[in-house]
Amino acid sequence: MTRHVYLCPLRWSDMDAYGHVNNVQFLRLLEEARVAMLFVEPKTADVMTLDGQLVVVRHEIEYTAPLVYRPEPIAIETWVTRIGGASFTVAYEVKDGEQVYARARTVLAAIDKESGRARRLAADERSWIDAYHEPEISA
């Protein structure tokens, strides 16, 4: 299992009237980390990617502590917990050392560019995604 770590800078505009990062902004931070793992960094390493053929099916976020603005980037660990026939689940932890600010999951589905319909993940895509696979532990 390999977790991707994205160091995400916070922006002043991420904060809300309560002085912490707004819940909606967390989705944007998670998107940045997910895009870095799936599309940006693999291309610089000349590795096959899904070429943008994904849609978000569902997001789930658990906020565990308020995150206030700071000049240092926040670490977002990203990995894959489930690989299905046409979809997979990406998990995240927004953290600083042992302090976890949020845990989240996103279900993504592969789509056909021409038809816009769901399609099965190809063997090479599954193999590439599997490099980040860490099965969830059931309680």
Task: Describe each model-derived feature in a short phrase.
Residues 1-75, 81-139:
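Terminal targeting signals and extreme-terminal segments of soluble enzymes
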